[in-house]
């Protein structure tokens, strides 16, 4: 097995035993990126010089006996995290040459543990998309089939795990942007509860929905990485001051007696037959492990996509108003006057999907439509949250598909934005409810594309979904399969 194939916990044991150094692991990963990333396009920026300096520092820590779970481990970051001295583009032309003066909290926490940052990963522009096709830096490709998308918006973060060009990655999830690409690329992707991980230093898309989370090769790695970045942060007023448990310690509890709910609105006609088969097999496996499977109802699910695309775009239109060419980012040349400089900078800097969402959001917030759209959407969001809270009075965890289909072809849905939006129908409600969800590899389609299983937990119920995911992973081999790169 190559160094770049190892999980966080496997590499940690080798580093601890001094069987391999962090410099060797980092060089192996940088060589792997050079060998295969031209096919995948998972990275926007690779940082070999900084990575090797961090690796040398990690080796000094290890020699001194100071080794944390992520010390010396090569990780990639979605290009939405601000990184001191490293270009941060958010997949957009408007930030093509932006170099931040500080690290976001999640990045700082990784550095505190001695993780090695090998680069910044491709994504949909400003995290707006489900296929990684809206990136100014070109689409990222799915390592399982280079003609398919890896999903989005954290497409590069998932593709790098599948291509084995990072040991672990961080992404963000606003409406499914960690879980859907994890499903399409055959890796584990966890969206924590809103407020569990600080958003300080994450470029904002929709501030009441965005959440930081890990993408990894297995569930143990997911627990390790979540434990490293979770926790209260005074720099983020929405972060919640609750203790961070040792997620790894609770993985082996098993699911005997666990009540698992199947929301009837998620098992609908139109579900791809391969996805349905994978879900049926997963349900049967949980039954055999002693879980108590029961049907539940989330009656307002049908309104989730419409609600999301009003709230998220409204917040985006406000958040993206700051990009005007004055203090940072792209500035249009040859503008006559300030007003034209604003409009030209934005017209040149933003791509079509971002413009579409800004227009949708501005419309929803405009005085004549504010009550009819935005206020109504917030009321429906409250109903959706209540649906989940009611369901969790009966069950511990929900089991659902992640997406109606496996990964789709590049350009297949570009002409029909609504089809693209609907591909997030099973992930969006979890963000609206503000709770946690995980994608775990659960099989393959007839065409050999990965299929993910979603487990949804109560607010701050990450331990339960990690335990349920680990029990599933232990009984299956899906997470061990490798993309043919």
Curated annotation (Swiss-Prot):
GO terms for biological process: translation. Keywords: ATP-binding, Ligase, Nucleotide-binding, Protein biosynthesis. GO terms for molecular function: ATP binding; glutaminyl-tRNA synthase (glutamine-hydrolyzing) activity. The keyword Protein biosynthesis applies. Its EC number is 6.3.5.7. It holds the Pfam family Amidase. SUPFAM superfamilies: Amidase signature (AS) enzymes. The active site is at residues 78, 153, 177. Gene3D superfamilies: Amidase signature (AS) domain. The keyword Lipid metabolism does not apply. It comes from the Bacteria. GO terms for cellular component: glutamyl-tRNA(Gln) amidotransferase complex. InterPro entries: Amidase, Amidase_CS, Amidase_dom, AS_sf, GatA. It catalyses: L-glutamyl-tRNA(Gln) + L-glutamine + ATP + H2O = L-glutaminyl-tRNA(Gln) + L-glutamate + ADP + phosphate + H(+). Heterotrimer of A, B and C subunits. Allows the formation of correctly charged Gln-tRNA(Gln) through the transamidation of misacylated Glu-tRNA(Gln) in organisms which lack glutaminyl-tRNA synthetase. The reaction takes place in the presence of glutamine and ATP through an activated gamma-phospho-Glu-tRNA(Gln). Belongs to the amidase family. GatA subfamily. This is Glutamyl-tRNA(Gln) amidotransferase subunit A. The gene is gatA.
């Amino acid at each position: 097995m190559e160094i770049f194939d190892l999980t966080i916990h496997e590499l940690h044991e080798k580093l601890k035993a001094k069987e391999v150094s962090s410099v060797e692991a980092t060089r192996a990963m940088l060589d792997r990126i050079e060998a295969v990333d031209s096919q995948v396009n998972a990275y926007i920026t690779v940082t070999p010089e900084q990575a090797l300096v961090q690796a040398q520092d990690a080796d000094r820590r290890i020699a001194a006996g100071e080794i944390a779970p992520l010390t010396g481990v090569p990780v990639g970051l979605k290009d939405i995290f601000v990184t001191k001295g490293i270009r941060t583009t958010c997949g957009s032309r408007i930030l093509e040459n932006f170099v931040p003066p500080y690290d976001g909290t999640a990045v700082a926490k990784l550095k505190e543990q001695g993780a090695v940052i090998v680069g910044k990963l491709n994504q949909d522009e400003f995290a707006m998309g489900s296929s990684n096709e809206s990136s100014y830096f070109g689409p990222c490709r799915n390592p399982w089939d280079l003609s398919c998308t890896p999903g989005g918006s954290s497409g590069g973060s998932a593709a790098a795990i599948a291509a084995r060009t990072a040991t672990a990655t961080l992404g963000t999830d606003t409406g499914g942007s960690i879980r859907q690409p994890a499903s399409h690329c055959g890796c584990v992707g966890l969206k924590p509860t809103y407020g569990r991980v600080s958003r300080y230093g994450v470029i904002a898309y929709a501030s009441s929905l965005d959440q930081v989370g890990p993408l990894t090769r297995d569930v143990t790695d997911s627990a390790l990485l979540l434990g490293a970045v979770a926790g209260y942060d005074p720099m983020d007023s929405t972060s919640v001051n609750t203790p961070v448990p040792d997620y790894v310690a609770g993985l082996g509890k098993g699911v005997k007696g666990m009540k698992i709910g199947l929301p009837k609105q998620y098992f609908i006609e139109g579900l791809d037959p391969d996805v349905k088969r994978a879900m049926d097999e997963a349900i049967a496996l949980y039954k055999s492990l002693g879980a108590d499977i029961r049907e539940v109802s989330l009656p307002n699910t049908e309104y989730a996509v419409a609600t999301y695309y009003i709230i998220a775009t409204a917040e985006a239109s406000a958040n993206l108003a700051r990009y005007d060419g004055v203090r940072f980012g792209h500035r249009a040349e040859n503008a006559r006057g300030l007003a034209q400089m604003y409009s030209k900078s934005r017209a040149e800097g933003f791509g079509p999907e971002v413009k579409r969402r800004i227009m949708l959001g501005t419309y929803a917030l405009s005085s004549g439509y504010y009550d009819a759209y935005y206020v109504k959407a917030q009321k429906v969001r409250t109903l959706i949250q209540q649906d989940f809270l009611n369901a969790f009075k009966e069950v511990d965890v929900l089991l659902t598909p992640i997406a109606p289909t496996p990964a789709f072809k590049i350009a297949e849905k570009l002409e029909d934005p609504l089809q693209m939006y609907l591909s997030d129908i099973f992930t969006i409600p979890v963000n609206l409810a503000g709770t946690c969800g995980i994608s775990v590899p659960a099989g393959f389609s007839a065409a050999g594309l990965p299929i993910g299983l979603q487990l949804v937990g109560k607010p701050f119920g990450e331990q339960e979904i990690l335990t349920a995911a680990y029990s599933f992973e232990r009984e299956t081999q899906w997470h061990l399969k490798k993309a043919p790169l």
